[in-house]
Amino acid sequence: DGITVNRISLANIQKVSNCKADLYIEKRLTGRYYLIRNVEIPNGVTLILDNFTNFNTAAGEFGLYIKLTDGDSFELTGDINPGNGTTTVPGTNTIFLSEVSVGDDIEISGETRTVTDIITDVSLTVSATYSDDLTTDTTPTCNPTALVDVIIN
């Protein structure tokens, strides 16, 4: 309330994929005004919006909202055999440090888990164990989260 926004920066900090962003101002009764809509931000790129026209930021007037959509799913490098009864997932010829981020979903042999830690290029941990009877998956899939740093000043 009563805050002036001069610049907004959105930086895609994902390791591999692009993300999409919507940035809009919404007034309680009159709807949304999109500053950007469905804009794809490549990984490693910062989108800067500045020179905002002043708008009434009195209590209850406007809200500033950012909606982020993750990038497309992609096939991970290497093979994964998670059927070891633990949340530690071993890989063979994988490059987890380069391709995966904490919060990403990993699908292995039809089962999906969320990455909670990346230990090395060939080892990460997930939110729950995979079934013990899974065989090695040579085409594991990553569904990345939308990792974007937002700076408003």
Residues covered by each model-derived region:
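A short beta-strand motif that forms part of the nucleic acid-binding face
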Residues: 25-27, 53, 128-130
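Intrinsic-disorder/low-complexity, polar/charged segments enriched in Ser/Thr/Lys/Arg/Asp/Glu/Gln
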Residues: 3-7, 46-48, 88, 123
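Aromatic- and Gly/Pro-enriched, solvent-exposed loop/edge beta-strand patches characteristic
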Residues: 29-73
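C-terminal interaction-tip segments
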Residues: 1-3, 7, 11-16, 20, ...
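Autoprocessing Asn-cyclization modules and mimics
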Residues: 73-144
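Beta-strand-rich, repetitive solenoid scaffolds
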Residues: 23-25, 36-38, 50, 67, ...
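Short, surface-exposed beta-strand/strand-loop-strand elements in extracellular ectodomains
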Residues: 15-37
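Extracellular and analogous surface-interaction loops
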Residues: 1-2, 13, 53-57, 93-96
